[in-house]
Amino acid sequence: MSASLQQSMLEAIETELKRQVARLDQTKVISFHEMLTYHMGWTGEGAGTQATGKRIRPLMALLSFASFHSPNHDAKTDWQNAVSAAAAIELIHNFSLVHDDIQDNSELRRGRKTVWTKWGAPMAINVGDALFVIANQSVLDVSNHYPAEVVVKASSILSQACLELTKGQFLDMSYEERTNLTIE
């Protein structure tokens, strides 16, 4: 894959993430939307490429998709049909970061104040929850390009991954307090 294809994918991912987060860009909840855009690295002090992160997870998803395309399709353009699913992966990652920052009492993320240190833990939990829901809506958006059974499978895989993520976070937190750890 060429560097220009990767750059096109990253640009498409960023555009899609902004489109998905814009679901909350409404007058009554504009400050809530601002919290999400702050966490995503788009607004506020220190906003920019360092604050957004590398977007490696959605990029890997699109590169994988392009690598395993059908011979009847063009890998150079087919990946565009999967951008909303790739964005869902990044949104899930960010949901987990917001919650993890609270759970670990982390005050900084990517060189900036975390959401909970700026707006408090209750608001940060709500921001994380919103990112989780938006991610689930984002994966469903592939229904514009794929049959229902593919969409259901993609949604199921994302849900299972989230369940595994929360189990891992539970273990992480519970191990912090344990003194009798074994290899098993």
Where are these regions (language model features)?
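Multi-pass membrane catalytic core of lipid/isoprenoid biosynthesis enzymes
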Residues: T117-Q137
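Short alpha-helical functional segments enriched in proximate histidine and acidic residues
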Residues: Q20, N94, S138, E164
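Short glycine/serine- and small hydrophobic-enriched flexible loop segments
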Residues: L62-A66, V133-D141
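Conserved N-terminal diphosphate/IPP-binding helix and adjacent helical/loop segment
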Residues: M1-I92, V98, I102-T117, D172-M173, ...
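All-alpha helical catalytic cores of prenyl diphosphate-utilizing isoprenoid enzymes
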Residues: A22-F32, G48-R57, I125-N126, V133, ...
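A generic hydrophobic-helix recognition signal that picks specific residues
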Residues: A86, H93-N94, P122, A161
